[in-house]
C-alpha cells in the first residue's frame, strides 16, 4: 500500500451530530475506488485511532435543473467508520 494514497483516500468528513454523539460513528466522503481495508488504514493513520468496522455505500448524484438546462451532480462514495470504545476523533481540529 502506497503511503501517499492513504492521505488521498479521505476527501472530506460528512458531519452529523446524531452519528458522532450517539454511536461513536463517523462518516467520510471517500474516493470512489477506495476499499474498506484502505479506508480503515487511512483513518487509523491520519487520526491515530483504532477502527472497529467500516461500512460503505455509493451515493447516486442528483439530477438538477437550472431553467431549461438539466445537469447532474457527481456520484460519490460514503464510508461509515465505527471506532473502538475509548477512541474519538475531533473533526473540527483535524486531529
From Swiss-Prot:
Pfam families in the record, alphabetically? Answer: Ribosomal_L23
GO terms (BP aspect): translation
Single annotated GO MF: structural constituent of ribosome
Report the transmembrane regions from the record.
none
GO CC annotation, single: cytosolic large ribosomal subunit
Does this entry carry the keyword Electron transport? no
Ribosomal protein as a keyword? yes
**Coiled-coil features, chain-numbered ranges:** none
Q: Which UniProt keywords apply?
A: Ribonucleoprotein, Ribosomal protein, RNA-binding, rRNA-binding
Self-association and partners:
Part of the 50S ribosomal subunit. Contacts protein L29, and trigger factor when it is bound to the ribosome.
User: What PANTHER family does the database record attribute to this sequence?
Assistant: 60S RIBOSOMAL PROTEIN L23A
Report the protein name in the record. Answer: Large ribosomal subunit protein uL23
Organism classification: Bacteria, Pseudomonadati, Pseudomonadota, Gammaproteobacteria, Legionellales
Amino acid at each position: 500500500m502506497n503511503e501517499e494514497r492513504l492521505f488521498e483516500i479521505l476527501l472530506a468528513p460528512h458531519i452529523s451530530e446524531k452519528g458522532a454523539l450517539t454511536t461513536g460513528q463517523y462518516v467520510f466522503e471517500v474516493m470512489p475506488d477506495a476499499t474498506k481495508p484502505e479506508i480503515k488504514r487511512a483513518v487509523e493513520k491520519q487520526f491515530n485511532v483504532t477502527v472497529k468496522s467500516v461500512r460503505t455505500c455509493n451515493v447516486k448524484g442528483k439530477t438538477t435543473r437550472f431553467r431549461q438546462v438539466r445537469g447532474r451532480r457527481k456520484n460519490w462514495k460514503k464510508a461509515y467508520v465505527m471506532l473502538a470504545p475509548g477512541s474519538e476523533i475531533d473533526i473540527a481540529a483535524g486531529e
